[in-house]
Amino acid sequence: MARKRREPETAAIVSVTHDGRGIADVTGKKVFVAGALEGETVRFQRRKRRRNFDEAELLEVLDASPSRIEPRCAVFGTCGGCSLQHVSDADQRAIKARALADNLERIGKVTPANWLDPIHATDGWPYRRRARLAVKDVPAKGRVLVGFRESHAPYVCDMQRCEVLAKPIDGLIDPLSDL
């Protein structure tokens, strides 16, 4: 017997995780929607069902958050190297600071008396100085792929450059593919 196909659903995103997944509360169950932001109304399709939560794919943003921006990278969404490029720099820092505070309180049982402002680059780009890149010879493409793994897949993302990597590292991706 064939599995029943689930219909797309609509929900309001009430919070966001450290890795850029929006959290919706649908009939008492948490649903993590990849790429959705706090304050947005989205249409999504559930992909993985668990006992306490579900994971979903974003189909459409019906009411966008003011934090949402156009990602700089052409392979954002496919590439697993970063998950918050669709969020403004200031809001990315706020999401990460909130995740740190939540983890310290929930896991470490520590509540700092005061917080220092995060240290960040002037414009926030590029911000990554280290990376673990995958390398795979793909005869069908006629070259070696060098890059991050695709999000939710074991494949190497076909990329020539990376917007978040510091320039000395970013400049090595394409030459390494030619080896």
Task: Show the residue positions of the predicted features.
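Accessory RNA-recognition modules of RNA-modification enzymes
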Residues: 1-179
